């Protein structure tokens, strides 16, 4: 017999399956042999903290090994090909969905596989430099593989988020992510899951090419209107029939390959060379809002005390505390982003002359610090205020009427370079005590930090653009009043957080998912401006795969 129950219980009863079973026996008189947690969330609004659970209790029978039907893949070795550029979550989920639909994915990834990539990340601290093709942004798994593995998304409108979580579980993630209100795999476990997804792609006839960088799209300018799928958008007789790519051999880009087929473009939000190529080729893009700011790091026990209303912090039974903060300052949103409880701050640059920070947490979330991005909203209409960040010469000559829409990208680059200069041209990060940042003074010394390459004292309040620093300072003051102890000299402001999302959107039709002027090109995921995190990128990847399948299978 299976009982489904809604429980509101103390943390010590909700700690694990055995403690829940003990609670059911002692408090409910249900002699369950096993339980399945369907939903789990923590209510810490009052001093007495409760855990809300929806559980299935199994009495006299065993629970199934998987709580969903596993997804079935079939051999596609001899099926028509679709090129997937990028092996982040958008690209990987697109590839798996293509296999389900009977098409062969050819995945082209500029970076290395997830194991080799980890070695390059480890070299950042001792060498104080970043490999431009293998870093926290580029490589198998994309930016999400080594930046926390959070699977929480507010978007429920664009696709089936449960499918994404189930596919992760099928490839080795814990089934707990199906129940948690804020599911999280962890940077220590997600790479193995990503590797298993690649193995599935290869096992069923797909291809994966690492250290292979797209350098151009192959465009057929002949008319498409004589046959095939009727065009509902202005493709001007142009369609994508493949890509040109170069292969890295012995540390040099040398061998040039062509891959033929329609293209799912899932290159991520840091592939700036792709944005410039599209603009120079007259392939329409437009400005998109994003947010820029800093990473704020507190001692984890302090955040636990604040969020759990208890001097003892989280104690034995609770996880490291999370927070989510948002306010408006002079008409623009200021908010926390990618909060990493019990985590650490990492160097997230993807090229030379850059210092960028991000955050991550291992699955246990048991580190000494907790950190979060603290960012200020920038809207497309704010672009005129950024006129002191001129475009590079290469953009002045581009054919696209949207060339000005690369201006926010230039703002990112200029701020990242300024951060690098402040860091003495190394991967150390400019930093300031939180109270000094708010008061407008240089810190005489700095707190300990999880940031491995090291910190250097810097007046971020001075060199950050005023429309960012002023809003952050006002928000910090407000949140310090709302959460006693939050505004403290024990916290550290670390620069700079610029990679919250893509600075542009690659324009596509909402129904066909194809670019508005070129058939056979499917802009996808966070880099194209249609997702914001692992799960939403995975959902968008699946939608693009379905659209690409419709396009391929309907053509003569």
Locations of the language-model features?
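Short Gly/Ser/Thr- and charged-rich N-terminal loops/segments
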Residues: 224-228, 232
């Amino acid at each position: 017999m299976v009982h489904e129950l809604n429980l509101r219980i103390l943390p010590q009863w909700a700690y694990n399956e055995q403690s829940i079973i003990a609670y059911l026996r002692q408090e409910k008189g249900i002699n369950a042999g096993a339980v399945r947690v369907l939903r789990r969330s923590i209510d810490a609004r009052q001093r007495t903290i409760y855990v809300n659970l929806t559980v299935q209790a199994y009495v006299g029978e065993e629970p199934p090994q998987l709580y969903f039907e596993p997804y079935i893949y079939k051999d596609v070795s001899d099926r028509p090909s679709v090129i997937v550029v990028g092996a982040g979550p958008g690209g990987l989920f697109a590839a798996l969905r293509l296999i389900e639909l009977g098409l062969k994915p050819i995945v082209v990834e500029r970076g290395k596989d997830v194991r080799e990539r980890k070695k390059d990340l480890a070299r950042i601290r001792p060498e104080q430099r970043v490999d431009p093709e293998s870093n926290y942004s580029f490589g198998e798994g994309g930016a999400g593989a080594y930046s926390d593995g959070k699977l929480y998304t507010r978007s429920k409108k664009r696709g089936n988020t449960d499918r994404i979580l189930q596919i992760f579980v099928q490839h080795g993630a814990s089934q707990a992510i199906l129940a948690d209100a804020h599911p999280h795999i962890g940077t220590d476990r997600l790479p193995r899951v990503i590797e298993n997804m690649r193995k599935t792609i290869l096992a069923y006839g797909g291809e994966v090419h690492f250290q292979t960088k797209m350098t151009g799209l192959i465009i057929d300018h002949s008319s498409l209107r004589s046959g095939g799928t009727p065009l509902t958008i202005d493709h001007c007789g142009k369609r994508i029939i493949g890509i040109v790519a170069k292969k890295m051999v012995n540390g040099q880009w040398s061998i040039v390959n062509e891959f033929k087929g329609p293209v799912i473009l899932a290159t991520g939000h840091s592939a700036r060379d792709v944005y410039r190529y599209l603009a120079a080729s007259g392939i329409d893009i437009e400005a998109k809002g994003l947010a820029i700011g800093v990473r704020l790091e507190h001692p984890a026990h302090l955040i636990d005390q604040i969020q759990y209303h208890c001097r003892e912090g989280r104690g034995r039974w609770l996880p490291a505390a999370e927070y989510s903060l948002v306010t408006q300052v002079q008409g623009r949103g200021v908010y926390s982003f990618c909060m990493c409880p019990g985590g650490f701050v990492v160097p997230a640059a993807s090229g030379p002359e850059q210092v960028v920070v991000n955050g991550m947490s291992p699955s246990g979330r048991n580190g000494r610090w907790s950190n979060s991005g603290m960012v200020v909203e920038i809207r497309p209409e704010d672009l005129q205020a950024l006129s002191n960040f001129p475009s590079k010469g290469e953009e002045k000559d581009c054919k696209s009427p949207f060339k000005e829409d690369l201006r926010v990208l230039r703002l990112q680059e200029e701020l990242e370079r300024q951060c690098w200069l402040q860091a003495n041209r190394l991967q150390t990060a400019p930093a300031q005590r939180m109270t000094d940042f708010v008061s407008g003074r240089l810190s005489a010394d700095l707190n300990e930090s999880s940031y491995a390459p090291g910190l250097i004292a810097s007046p971020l309040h001075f060199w950050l653009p005023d429309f960012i620093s002023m809003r952050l300072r006002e928000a910090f003051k407000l949140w310090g009043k709302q959460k006693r102890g939050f505004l403290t000299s024990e916290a550290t402001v670390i620069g700079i957080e610029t990679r919250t999302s893509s600075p542009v959107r690659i324009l596509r039709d909402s129904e066909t998912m194809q670019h508005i002027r070129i058939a056979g090109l499917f802009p996808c995921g966070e880099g194209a401006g249609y997702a914001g995190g692992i799960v939403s990128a995975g959902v968008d990847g699946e939608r693009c795969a379905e659209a690409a399948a419709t396009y391929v299978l309907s053509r003569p």
